[in-house]
């Protein structure tokens, strides 16, 4: 499977047993569709035939500018993690 695309690399906390998947909790806004698209992209990226990985995800408030910026950064981090897992890093 080809790696997902991302524009930056960031360090991530290690897997935690408390979370089962990375999700974007956005609903009922124009940004909700963006959140859904991000979730679908990550789900597609993570469907490679490898064991499931437990990841911690941030709590995000998409109704603020800072929250939207954090959501985009978290999405890039998740893509980086997905790429690393697909490459076996």
From Swiss-Prot:
GO cellular component, one term: membrane
Subunit structure: Interacts (via C-terminus) with the spanin inner membrane subunit (via C-terminus). Part of the spanin complex which spans the entire periplasmic space. The spanin complex is composed of spanin inner membrane subunit and spanin outer membrane subunit.
Domain of life per record: Viruses
Biased amino acid composition, Polar residues: 1-10
Protein name per UniProt: Probable spanin, outer lipoprotein subunit
Span of the signal peptide: 1-47
Keywords: Cytolysis, Host cell lysis by virus, Host cell outer membrane, Host membrane, Lipoprotein, Membrane, Signal, Viral release from host cell
Location in or out of the cell: Host cell outer membrane
Primary role: Component of the spanin complex that disrupts the host outer membrane and participates in cell lysis during virus exit. The spanin complex conducts the final step in host lysis by disrupting the outer membrane after holin and endolysin action have permeabilized the inner membrane and degraded the host peptidoglycans. Host outer membrane disruption is possibly due to local fusion between the inner and outer membrane performed by the spanin complex.
Gene Ontology process terms (BP): killing of cells of another organism
Natural source organism: Pseudomonas phage phiKMV
